[in-house]
Amino acid sequence: MESGAYGAAKAGGSFDLRRFLTQPQVVARAVCLVFALIVFSCIYGEGYSNAHESKQMYCVFNRNEDACRYGSAIGVLAFLASAFFLVVDAYFPQISNATDRKYLVIGDLLFSALWTFLWFVGFCFLTNQWAVTNPKDVLVGADSVRAAITFSFFSIFSWGVLASLAYQRYKAGVDDFIQNYVDPTPDPNTAYASYPGASVDNYQQPPFTQNAETTEGYQPPPVY
């Protein structure tokens, strides 16, 4: 087991705040958290409007409720996930089990790759709905809508960077394991025993041997 596996410091050391804040994945994750906060705040705050003659609220993205729900959902989940993985990054050097580290890095890689794709879909979806929106339906909040679209676009790259960094950490951990792996080959000088605890003699008497008695010569029977 390597205590420094998967791109983390040696387990058991003291927490270094400066080193933690300068780690690439921590910086990228903080950027993702801010972008997600901006997206869902803009949609929640000014993504809904109503006509003068009605109090019924509707989504300003072409009155498509799915557009507002989708943008808000991926924004909230991205914010929560970013906060969670920031805590994991802070606690990661204290994890001495290489298997636990591997699973956390794989989870980070899969989630970051998935959210990169979801942000791309969200950007295309919101841009399309905003392009066909009737300007008369947007009484207020046009700037917030544009901000949500803009930071959805930026989030594609920030989460892509996170996925790339997670892959580099995973690959470094696998390469480190391969380099330090020792094949437990048996010692050829060690005798093999069929049963545990059985003693092995260096010399075994060959089968079917008899101890021959030597005769000094022929002795005739006594004569009476």
Curated annotation (Swiss-Prot):
Membrane-crossing segments per the record: 26-46, 73-93, 105-125, 147-167
Post-translational modification: May be tyrosine phosphorylated by Src.
InterPro entries, A to Z: Marvel, Synaptogyrin
Modified residues (Phosphoserine): 3
Complexes and interactors: (Microbial infection) Interacts with SFTS phlebovirus protein NSs; may be involved in virus replication.
Organism in which the protein naturally occurs: Homo sapiens (Human)
One Pfam match: MARVEL
One GO cellular component term noted in the UniProt record for this chain: membrane
Places the protein is found: Cytoplasmic vesicle membrane; Cytoplasmic vesicle, Secretory vesicle, Synaptic vesicle membrane; Lipid droplet
All residue ranges annotated as the MARVEL domain in the record: 20-171
Function as written in the Swiss-Prot or TrEMBL entry: May play a role in regulated exocytosis. In neuronal cells, modulates the localization of synaptophysin/SYP into synaptic-like microvesicles and may therefore play a role in the formation and/or the maturation of this vesicles. May also play a role in GLUT4 storage and transport to the plasma membrane. (Microbial infection) May play a role in the assembly of cytoplasmic inclusion bodies required for SFTS phlebovirus replication.
Sorted UniProt keywords: Acetylation, Cytoplasmic vesicle, Host-virus interaction, Lipid droplet, Membrane, Phosphoprotein, Synapse, Transmembrane, Transmembrane helix
Family (UniProt): Belongs to the synaptogyrin family.
Modified residue annotations for N-acetylmethionine: 1
Lineage: Eukaryota, Metazoa, Chordata, Craniata, Vertebrata
Protein name: Synaptogyrin-2
Membrane-protein topology: Multi-pass membrane protein
Record's note on what induces expression: (Microbial infection) Up-regulated upon SFTS phlebovirus infection (at protein level).
GO biological process: regulated exocytosis; synaptic vesicle membrane organization
PANTHER family, A to Z: SYNAPTOGYRIN, SYNAPTOGYRIN-2
Tissue: Ubiquitous; low expression in brain.
